[in-house]
Amino acid sequence: MLKRLCTILAASALAAPLALGIARANGTEELTPYKMIRSLQYVQDSVVLGDHSAIEMQRFMLGAIDERLRAADHSAFRDPRNVDAALVYVMSGGNPATLDLLADRDIEGNFDSRVTDALRQYLNGKGPLIVENLTKAAPEYKNSRIGPYLFLILGNAMSQQDPIEAMKHYDWARLTAPGTIIEEAALRRSVSLAAQAGLPEKGFRYALNYARRYLTSPFASQFADVFVELAVAHFDEAADGRVSEILSFMDSARQREVYLRVARRAAIAGNQALARLASRRAEELAGDDSSRSQVLASFYEGLAAVPSADVFSAAEALEAIPDEKLSPRDRALREAAKAVADAVVRPPLGESPAQAPAPIAERPAGEQSELAAEESGSGMSPFGQPVEASPGRPSEMTAEADVAASDDPALDGFLASGRSKIDEIDALLKGEGQ
């Protein structure tokens, strides 16, 4: 009886402030912006910690705060907490036009023009232009309410120019805002930058921290993309142990998905050993639960085997997989693999020295554009970068042309055919990423 009475009293104590708040909201008193922004921060942090039902509340809160900021009298922003609330709002997915309105109406100088100008440029897609000015202004806000947000924005703005320095800004942002959407974003983006900068140990450390805390985030799929990029680019015996440690925080279905992504990326990159290893681990995790996962694992293992001595068996295995079991992107991969297999097993053109190479059928222009659009769609990693030509490629092509300019017409024809086949494969794989 006493226990039940204590429970009732505790519930009453918690309900009283909520009821009072609702009564005030329905009355003449309006919530100030800084109080509303606290609720938004709580909701956003709940989302990345796994409460996906709060996503709709986040949208509602953003709309309500937008209306409140636009309706606020300019005197409200004499309180620095409301100024910070307006800045946090726009850095949390709010309406950029609201910041424009508030900055233009600020006749008392309540807003720091260095910060508002930088944010307005950043939100208009001009991130690289703000680096110099925000680098000077941000340290003044290190210990303020907006500090973690500014350092996250600064890291984003300079990530392509200086990924190592950007990671330092991400470190500061996440360490001053643990357990928040700021830390989640900073860790996820740091994994991508570490992969780009060739710092695998640092990248795996970021990935481990992310896996421990944020696997239930709605952005975890983006993390999986950049983690796969890191694992494939820097895989060795030591990395294998780190990958296994990070995946241990995932359930079997997520582990299988990651291994399938690793197998696919490794097969495209020509890393046969890794593609086979990841495919076999995905098959082991699939068991009897997912026939499609087993098919994909076998498919990626077959892709990896195409350039090997077992090319005939690999080509037959790939051909045996039904089209409906593969996505359009994987069907394009299979076409490329078949083209490679045909080039490997085709005998040299030695019957007639003057025989011209057979023409290679090209895809219609419309079909190629459709494939390119599909390959660059939502299935690609948001952090993926377009494939860039290797600096050494022109000299390689020049050397190849020198060899081709020999006195052997059969060799000329074989090399010309090979170059045409490579061009065809490149077209099929366009948009796949590295």
Curated annotation (Swiss-Prot):
The GO biological-process annotations, alphabetized, read as: archaeal or bacterial-type flagellum-dependent cell motility; chemotaxis
Instruction: Tell me what this protein is called.
Output: Chemotaxis protein MotC
Q: What is its main location?
A: periplasm
Q: Does the keyword Signal apply?
A: yes
Q: Which domain of life is it from?
A: Bacteria
Q: Gene that codes for this?
A: motC
Q: Which UniProt keywords apply?
A: Chemotaxis, Flagellar rotation, Periplasm, Signal
Q: Where in the cell is it found?
A: Periplasm
The UniProt annotation puts the region (Disordered) at 344-417
Q: Is Signal tagged as a keyword?
A: yes
Q: Which organism is it from?
A: Rhizobium meliloti (strain 1021) (Ensifer meliloti)
A single GO cellular-component term on record: periplasmic space
Q: What does this protein do?
A: Required for the rotation of the flagellar motor. Might control the energy flux or coupling that drives flagellar rotation.
Q: Which residues form the signal peptide?
A: 1-15
